[in-house]
Design a protein with these regions (language model features):
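Structural alpha/beta surface segment adjacent to cysteine/selenocysteine redox centers
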Residues: 18-124
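Short active-site neighborhood of thiol/selenol oxidoreductases, capturing the structured segment around
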Residues: 1-21, 34
Length: 124
């Protein structure tokens, strides 16, 4: 079976969904080939870190810093429930274009490394 999905390494829900998908595949004892496609949630995100995830949430959604911390903490809790060593609160907001380029290079030149690379990029 081949599964194609679009993902951004800056998206915590993509990481959580990827973890859930892999668990289901393992539980069902399926053989799967993944085709991971790039999707940039924010093409205009700066390359240089300018804000924390909490600050970005506050600005993007018009929240107080305290409310943004609560939202980010809820997302972290979802990841922890899935067994992810999730520290979303301390994630720095930056552009993911180069990470997607690296993934494309791996897919083209060393496809056997793609899953490990994807996990490493999510955990970075």
């Amino acid at each position: 079976m081949k599964i194609t999905y679009w993902s951004d390494f800056a998206c915590p829900y993509c990481y959580i969904g990827n973890t859930r998908l892999k668990r289901a595949i393992k539980d069902l004892n399926l053989e799967v080939e993944f085709d991971i496609r790039a999707f940039e949630l924010d093409q205009n995100a700066p390359k240089d870190v300018q804000s924390t995830t909490v600050e970005r949430f506050a600005q993007k959604y018009g929240l107080s810093i305290e409310d943004a911390k609560k939202q980010v903490s809820q997302i972290s809790s979802l990841g922890i429930e899935e067994g992810i060593d999730f520290k979303y609160e301390s994630t720095l907001y930056t552009n993911t274009r180069d990470a997607h380029r690296l993934m494309k290079l791996a897919q083209d030149k060393h496809p056997e490394t793609v899953e490990k690379l994807a996990t490493s990029l999510f955990e970075a």
